[in-house]
Amino acid sequence: MKIVADENLAFTDYFFSEFGDIQYKAGRTLTHTDVQDAEALLVRSVTAVNESLIQNTALKYVGSATIGTDHLDIQALEKQGITWANAAGCNAQAVAEYVITALLHLDASLLEQQEKFTLGIVGLGNVGKRLAYMAQLLGWKVIGFDPYVQLDSIENVSFQTLLQQANAVSIHVPLTKKGEHATYHLFDEKAFAALQPNTILINSARGPVVKEAALIEDIQRTQRKVVLDVFEHEPVISEELLNMLALATPHIAGYSLEGKARGTQMIYEAFCQKFGYDINKRFETQLPACEDYFSGHDLKAVLKQKLSQIYDIAQDDANIRACVKEGKVEQKAFDLLRKNYPLRREWAAHGGPQA
């Protein structure tokens, strides 16, 4: 069997080499010719899997080792009779830890604020519910908005109420452009007007959920602290926007070693189900041991002392800013940051909590 795989997927050889010949390709520039005689295609979110890519091919299976599906033309896949799978929730823990790291980097005193600090979570799916759990471990008050999901463990409120009450807002919705609850430009001029000026905003979901022009106007007006891991015009990012952000990272919020490995394992399991193979591999057997920071210690004390050793978000911020050339970060530089990213470990690898 011929398998075409994104060159940046983790542990592809471990999971798939026994099944056939793996050909590695750059995901963003994948062509119909690349996949024409392949039976399986393994991708990330940078590959648009659409009708022009998949029609008149030998493809029987497409697996995306990512949580989202907005890059997959599901209708076209099903029309062609191609089985597809994604990896919903694979990196949810990593994203939740990213958000908490960003908040504590901006204000370490949040560790002492308990319920004086209110975190508003927009989207209560795989990431949102884990973030709620982790935030409550720190004693924070958590409110959430999701038109489809309610969590018993938090106060569920309207979007407008969340914008007005939260000290920080973290976005965890898929990108959708149709329907009553479309998320495209969910954060527009109206939403920013409802936010308190000192409310922190974090987007680690999908770039176009936040309308960039409205965001720039808002920061100019309020001096708001904003953290972006995703961008509306990604992979190109303007220097003007970067200079306004409190923290910027190159779409790596979910880039933990565990998250990457878990994503590949999930599409491996779907692959095995499709082709009738036994599922007999686990990513945990491939991970190196880590130094234990948390066991037997107070969670807040460890985060106060070891946060930058667990994940140095300031270095990621510095790296993306160093890529600015002629007023912007170009696609090539952005993609290289992601390709060469030193995958961090989740807190649990250091003996810490996990949602």
Swiss-Prot record:
NAD(+) binds at residues 146, 229, 254. Keywords: Cytoplasm, NAD, Oxidoreductase, Pyridoxine biosynthesis. GO terms for biological process: pyridoxine biosynthetic process. One of its GO terms (molecular function) is protein dimerization activity. Substrate binds at residues 45, 66, 255. Its main location: cytoplasm. It catalyses: 4-phospho-D-erythronate + NAD(+) = (R)-3-hydroxy-2-oxo-4-phosphooxybutanoate + NADH + H(+). Signal peptide: none annotated. It is found in: Cytoplasm. GO terms for cellular component: cytoplasm. Catalyzes the oxidation of erythronate-4-phosphate to 3-hydroxy-2-oxo-4-phosphonooxybutanoate. Belongs to the D-isomer specific 2-hydroxyacid dehydrogenase family. PdxB subfamily. This is Erythronate-4-phosphate dehydrogenase. The gene is pdxB.
